[in-house]
């Protein structure tokens, strides 16, 4: 988690705290995604932004200043006016440019009186694509960078941007050569009709060598051009190509913003078109396209605002339309003619009004995704013909009233997701005809009364999600008729009493979540009849006694979560009958003794979590019989001696977590043979000597963490044989000398953390040969001389972190520039300084 907070930080405050207005050196921009941060001397607010992949990133904006500027325009949401104002300042020349490599800082002098502020500082910094893409700052960035190009006396910036454009054009040229060459008349006999192109295929001989393709244009059925950053030129180029049999075209993640020439695509047999992950805002060109056989159109993750052009498009056979994660606020389909449409995805937009859906014929629609919008009112469902709808996704909206479902006709509905809304009353479910419903998700609402479930007729229901509500009484479950229920999710409520579970008839139940409630006793479990139960989670309660588990009939149980309770005694585990148990979590309890594990019969156990307890020794682990164990978590205990690990035989162990204990040495690793170990965590102990690593046998080890210890000497790494090592954490130790890295053979090392040590000399960087290195973290050391960077065999490095040292800024800027000029394949995209 520490690494994530460092590498995914938008603009590190330390890197910009001492900007020198007189230092007008060449700023550093690389890549096509730039970070932006607005700041002044009043305040700075950090924001967490959540992306589709679930990761969270930090962006920094001066919210106070933007608010003041918005007040000037009498509209807090008039961001475009703010952009226009900033552009106006640039055009008028009210700016100066400073730098703190890799950042370019534009200081804009405010011409109007806005309280105490008299300037705006805008920091542009490079960002590698894998660290995220803040889409709602892109419009700002595009306007700004376009104006920068027009500014006189900023040739260095323009030059850099032009160089980036030249790279992009070269990729397009290479692509043209590849595709054009495939039309050679001598290549007529190949049966292969798919082309997949990636960045490594820039020459035709490499392309043919990789795929063995020798085909003319008229044979191609699938063309994959995803992730190439080809820009708008790829649309222009493809418009001139003739692929009469092309059925599938993928152009995702190519930095495309303009598709006006898509109307000239001569692909009469096209069935699937993917333009996802681009910067497209205008789709009016689709009105003129002739894709009569198109069945799938994917446009999610763009900047689309207006989808009205789709009304007039000739996509009569369209079955899947994906428009998620755009900027759509209005869904007008008054002339909607997609009568064969089966799936419509409009998630992650700004839609608040869906009444226009009543104008559409959705008689064949099976999936409708409107989640993650601002919808409050859904009465329109009463007017729409959804007779074939099977899945309706409405989670993460502002819905409070669901009475419409008692009037709407969803006879074939199988999935209804209403989680994370403002629903309190669900009594209307009694009147709903959900005869085919299999999954009902009402989690994350304000529901307290669930008595309605005694009156509903959901005979096919398999999943009921009621997590994160205000439920404290579940006695009504006794009167339900959920014979087919397989998953019951009741976590994060206020439930104290679960005695009703002994009376319910959930003979098909496989998953039961009761974690983070107010349970003190689980004795009732011995009276339950859940013969098919596979997963039981009762963590985060106040349970101290688990003896009832010995009397349960959970012979199919695979996962048992008992974490975050008050358990002190687990001796009962020797008597339970869980022959197929794969996951046992006892984390964050009060365990001091785990000797019972030697008497258990968990022969299929994969994951054992004993972290955050009070264990001082684990000698008994040498007697356990866990032949399938892959993950062992022992962090945050009081372990001092782990010599017992020399006696264990965990041939399949992948993860060993030993951080935050009281280890002062790692002698227990001498001669240890964990042939399948991939991750070893030893951080946050008192380790000084790591010489035992030289005899450890971890042929598959990819990640080793020795951070936050007392290590001074790392010369032993010369004799360490970890051929697959990719990530090494040595940060926050007492390391001064790193010269031994010259002889270290970690050929696959990608990330090296040496930050927060006592390093002053980095001469060794001239000699190390980590050709796969992507990230080098050296911040918060005593480094002054960075000349060795000029001879650094940079390989694939993309992130270099040096802030918090004693480096002269002017020398630093010159060094980075020198590195860039001397290395042809310069991939460094982020310098944190």
Give, region by region, the residue ranges found by the protein language model.
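Leucine-rich repeat domain C-terminal region
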Residues: 775-780, 793-833
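Conserved hydrophobic beta-strand positions in leucine-rich repeat
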Residues: 223-225, 249-251, 271-275, 295-299, ...
């Amino acid at each position: 988690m520490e690494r994530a907070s460092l590498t995914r930080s938008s603009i590190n405050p330390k890197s910009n705290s001492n900007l020198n207005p007189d230092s007008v050196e060449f700023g550093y921009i690389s890549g096509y995604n730039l970070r932006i941060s607005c700041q002044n001397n009043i305040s700075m607010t950090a924001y967490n932004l959540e992306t589709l992949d679930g990761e969270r990133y930090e962006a920094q904006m001066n919210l106070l200043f933007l608010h003041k500027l918005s007040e000037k325009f009498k509209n807090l949401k008039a961001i475009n006016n703010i952009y226009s104002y900033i552009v106006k300042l640039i055009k008028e020349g009210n700016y100066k440019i400073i730098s703190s490599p890799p950042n370019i800082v534009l200081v804009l002098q405010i011409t109007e009186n806005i309280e105490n502020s008299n300037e705006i500082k805008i920091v542009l910094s490079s960002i590698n694509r894998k660290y995220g893409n803040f889409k709602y700052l892109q419009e700002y960035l595009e306007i700004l960078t376009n104006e920068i190009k027009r500014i006189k006396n900023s040739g260095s910036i323009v030059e850099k941007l032009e160089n980036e454009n030249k790279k992009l054009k070269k990729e397009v040229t290479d692509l043209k050569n590849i595709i054009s060459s495939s039309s050679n008349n001598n290549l007529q006999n190949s049966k292969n009709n798919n082309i997949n192109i990636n960045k490594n295929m820039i020459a035709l001989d490499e392309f043919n060598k990789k795929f063995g393709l020798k085909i003319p244009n008229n044979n191609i059925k699938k063309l994959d051009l995803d992730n190439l950053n080809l820009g708008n030129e790829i649309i222009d180029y493809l418009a001139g190509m003739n692929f009469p049999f092309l059925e599938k075209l993928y152009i995702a993640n190519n930095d495309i913003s303009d598709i006006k020439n898509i109307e000239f695509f001569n692909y009469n047999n096209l069935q699937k078109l993917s333009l996802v992950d681009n910067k497209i805002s205008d789709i009016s060109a689709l009105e003129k396209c002739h894709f009569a056989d198109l069945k799938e159109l994917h446009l999610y993750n763009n900047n689309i605002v207006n989808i009205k052009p789709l009304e007039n498009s000739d996509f009569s056979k369209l079955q899947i339309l994906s428009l998620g994660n755009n900027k759509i606020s209005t869904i007008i389909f008054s002339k909607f003619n997609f009568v064969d449409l089966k799936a419509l995805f409009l998630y992650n937009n700004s839609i608040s009004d869906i009444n226009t859906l009543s104008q559409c014929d959705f008689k064949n629609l099976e999936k409708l995704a409107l989640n993650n919008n601002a919808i409050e009112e859904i009465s329109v469902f009463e007017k729409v013909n959804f007779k074939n709808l099977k899945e309706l996704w409405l989670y993460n909206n502002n819905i409070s009233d669901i009475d419409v479902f008692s009037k709407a006709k969803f006879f074939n509905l199988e999935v209804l997701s209403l989680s994370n809304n403002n629903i309190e009353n669900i009594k209307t479910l009694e009147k709903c005809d959900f005869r085919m419903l299999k999954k009902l998700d009402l989690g994350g609402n304000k529901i307290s009364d669930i008595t309605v479930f005694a009156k509903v007729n959901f005979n096919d229901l398999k999943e009921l999600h009621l997590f994160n509500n205000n439920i404290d009484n579940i006695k009504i479950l006794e009167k339900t008729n959920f014979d087919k229920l397989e998953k019951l999710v009741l976590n994060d409520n206020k439930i104290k009493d679960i005695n009703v579970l002994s009376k319910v008839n959930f003979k098909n139940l496989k998953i039961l979540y009761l974690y983070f409630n107010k349970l003190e006793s689980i004795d009732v479990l011995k009276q339950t009849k859940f013969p098919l139960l596979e997963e039981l989670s009762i963590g985060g309660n106040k349970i101290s006694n688990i003896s009832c588990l010995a009397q349960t009939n959970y012979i199919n149980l695979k996962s048992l979560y008992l974490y975050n309770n008050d358990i002190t005694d687990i001796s009962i585990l020797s008597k339970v009958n869980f022959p197929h148990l794969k996951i046992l979590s006892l984390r964050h309890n009060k365990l001091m003794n785990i000797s019972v594990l030697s008497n258990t019969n968990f022969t299929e156990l994969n994951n054992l979590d004993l972290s955050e307890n009070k264990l001082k020794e684990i000698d008994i682990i040498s007697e356990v019989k866990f032949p399938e164990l892959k993950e062992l978590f022992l962090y945050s205990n009081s372990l001092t001696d782990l010599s017992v690990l020399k006696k264990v035989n965990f041939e399949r162990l992948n993860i060993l977590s030993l951080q935050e204990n009281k280890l002062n040495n790692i002698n227990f690793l001498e001669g240890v043979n964990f042939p399948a170990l991939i991750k070893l965590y030893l951080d946050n102990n008192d380790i000084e000597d790591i010489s035992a690593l030289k005899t450890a046998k971890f042929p598959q080890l990819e990640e080793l963490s020795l951070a936050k210890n007392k290590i001074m000497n790392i010369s032993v790494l010369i004799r360490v044989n970890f051929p697959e090592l990719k990530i090494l954490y040595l940060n926050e130790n007492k390391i001064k000398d790193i010269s031994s890295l010259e002889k270290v053979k970690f050929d696959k090392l990608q990330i090296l953390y040496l930050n927060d040590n006592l390093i002053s000399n980095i001469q060794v960087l001239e000699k190390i040969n980590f050709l796969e290195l992507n990230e080098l973290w050296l911040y918060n050391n005593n480094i002054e001389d960075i000349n060795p960077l000029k001879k650094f065999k940079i390989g694939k490095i993309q992130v270099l972190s040096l802030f918090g040292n004693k480096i002269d800024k002017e020398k630093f800027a010159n060094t980075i520039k020198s590195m860039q000029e001397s290395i042809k394949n310069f991939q460094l995209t982020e310098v944190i300084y």
